[in-house]
Amino acid sequence: MANHDLPRVASRFNTDGQGATRARAVGVMLYALRGTPFIYQGEELGLPDAKIPPEQAVDVDGRDPQRAPIPWQPPSVAGPGAGFTTGTPWLPLDE
């Protein structure tokens, strides 16, 4: 249902503010299918795509929003690295 080249499910199906509900429905469908489910980082948490300003974009194909680091803690608690790093991440973390 998703991979590193597609917007995260919570963003892709959020046309009317129902992204979280639809992401849960997609998760239920995915786990009900036969075989091994594969999920990409952030999908298991229902994270939406990160909002990356054009001047901070790294990928010319525009795939940075779904490749941003997963925040381990809120930036308000852990600082600008959100518990992910004490350095500067390659891509900015979403609030």
Question: What kind of feature is each model-predicted range?
Answer:
Residues M1-G17:
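Active-site clefts of carbohydrate-active enzymes
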Residues G17-E95:
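Loop/helix patches that line or flank the sugar-binding groove of alpha-linked glycan CAZymes
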